[in-house]
Amino acid sequence: MLKQITLYTDGSCLGNPGPGGYAAVLIYKQHRKELAQGYELTTNNRMELMAAIAGLQSLSEPCQVRLTTDSQYVRQGITQWIHGWKKKGWKTANREPVKNVDLWLLLDSEIQRHDVEWFWVKGHSGHPENERCDELARNAALADSRLIDSGYPS
């Protein structure tokens, strides 16, 4: 039986594009793990994707994951839009290249390892774990230890 993990994610970008950060909060029984990282120049959508990727990558074995995000872009992208993008060779309905394809490929790879159920929560609506992720992501975006987002612009 797979371990049941609850994962909350959020991304932040100050300027969009600008300095950004992501955060993930993972909960397994009484255990809690918080992840966050900042980047020098990125976008909000990239940070939302990175949050989900980082959370899933941090799991050392396949798990049953209840992933909650405040990003409709991430939730709809991975549950609906990705199927059409793959069929069209990573092009949109308008035949434009899919933005952030490097991260969509990573996220698609990660969800193959896990049984992921996707949930959406309205951002800044008082949900405690989403608010915590927002705080961690903003702090990461402001931190001195920001990395370079090698995929931006993609």
Curated annotation (Swiss-Prot):
This is Ribonuclease H. Belongs to the RNase H family. It catalyses: Endonucleolytic cleavage to 5'-phosphomonoester. One of its GO terms (molecular function) is nucleic acid binding. Mg(2+) 1 binds at residues 10, 48, 70. It is found in: Cytoplasm. The gene is rnhA. HAMAP family: RNase_H. It comes from Tolumonas auensis (strain DSM 9187 / NBRC 110442 / TA 4). The lineage of its organism: Bacteria, Pseudomonadati, Pseudomonadota, Gammaproteobacteria, Aeromonadales. InterPro entries: RNase_H, RNaseH-like_sf, RNaseH_domain, RNaseH_sf, RNaseHI. Its EC number is 3.1.26.4. Its main location: cytoplasm. Monomer. GO terms for cellular component: cytoplasm. GO terms for biological process: DNA replication, removal of RNA primer. Gene3D superfamilies: Ribonuclease H-like superfamily/Ribonuclease H. It is an enzyme of class 3 (hydrolase). Endonuclease that specifically degrades the RNA of RNA-DNA hybrids.
